[in-house]
């Protein structure tokens, strides 16, 4: 189990940062270094844990039932946490084993989690990336970005218990609670174009008519968490995210992946408010406010005709705020 150790931190309560042009750009970095993961853990939260001997199908249904996106995996034989089961696993299973709407996906119906892990990882078992509650939030952000993961279990080193799952979204929301107390860094007033935050080359997208199975292949190949859905002119009309895929389990429609992404997205049409977008000329402050208020994981960057130009994710934002002080990532 690969855990991030705690650093010795300054006082953890509200800091009095010196307001100088030099220090302003690192004000969020200082904040993250002076707060521990423990500070972010709510007094009450839902945590679902799966034993690796559980059937894969039951595990995914349990994710849906409990309204969570991932769960730590407990290996009874090793008496330790060995990994995470996420929607990405569901996508990988469907993509690997789906044949046609007429053939049942035996591996999804019958495999245990441990069987799937053996097949999928094929002896390339990586230790579970986790973090101590006493480690700084700066360490947590660094670990999320360095390991290219979206969920970081907070595990008590003494008891071995999982206390919470840290995500980019939860960390940014926590930072936003205190953001008005700090002097505003200069880069917050700069535009996306000036800061070059986000991804603007080789954007993975799908058409409205793209079959779900093809979309799953793009998720697997490009390792992205969402795909803008575009019309024939390249204008964004919808977005198909990994989280939408778990609905196939909720509706038990995972045996027919030949339907279009448009049809697969009909389940949420009654409350879907449209794709959340932004423009290159908008400031970083505006972008952060939009992301936090809408509680989404990314914004689609478009031009004045709604043609997709790029994607800005929570990971991009945290990297800019905390690790690079508004500078373009190396």
UniProtKB/Swiss-Prot annotation:
One of its GO terms (biological process) is fatty acid biosynthetic process. ATP 2 binds at residues 69, 151, 169, 241-244, 268, 276, 297-298. GO terms for cellular component: cytosol; nucleoplasm; nucleotide-activated protein kinase complex; nucleus. Residues 1-21 are annotated as: Disordered. The modification Phosphoserine is found at residues 260, 269. AMP 3 binds at residues 150, 199, 204, 225-226, 297, 313-316. The modification Phosphothreonine is found at residue 262. Phosphorylated by ULK1 and ULK2; leading to negatively regulate AMPK activity and suggesting the existence of a regulatory feedback loop between ULK1, ULK2 and AMPK. Glycosylated; O-GlcNAcylated by OGT, promoting the AMP-activated protein kinase (AMPK) activity. AMP 1 binds at residues 84-89, 129, 150-151. ADP 2 binds at residues 69, 169, 241-244, 268, 276, 297-298. A motif (AMPK pseudosubstrate) lies at residues 137-158. ADP 1 binds at residues 84-89, 129, 150-151. ATP 1 binds at residues 69, 84-89, 129, 150-151. AMP 2 binds at residues 69, 169, 241-244, 268, 276, 297-298. One of its GO terms (molecular function) is ATP binding. AMPK is a heterotrimer of an alpha catalytic subunit (PRKAA1 or PRKAA2), a beta (PRKAB1 or PRKAB2) and a gamma non-catalytic subunits (PRKAG1, PRKAG2 or PRKAG3). Interacts with FNIP1 and FNIP2. Belongs to the 5'-AMP-activated protein kinase gamma subunit family. The AMPK pseudosubstrate motif resembles the sequence around sites phosphorylated on target proteins of AMPK, except the presence of a non-phosphorylatable residue in place of Ser. In the absence of AMP this pseudosubstrate sequence may bind to the active site groove on the alpha subunit (PRKAA1 or PRKAA2), preventing phosphorylation by the upstream activating kinase STK11/LKB1. PANTHER family: 5'-AMP-ACTIVATED PROTEIN KINASE SUBUNIT GAMMA-1, AMP-ACTIVATED PROTEIN KINASE, GAMMA REGULATORY SUBUNIT. This is 5'-AMP-activated protein kinase subunit gamma-1. The gene is Prkag1.
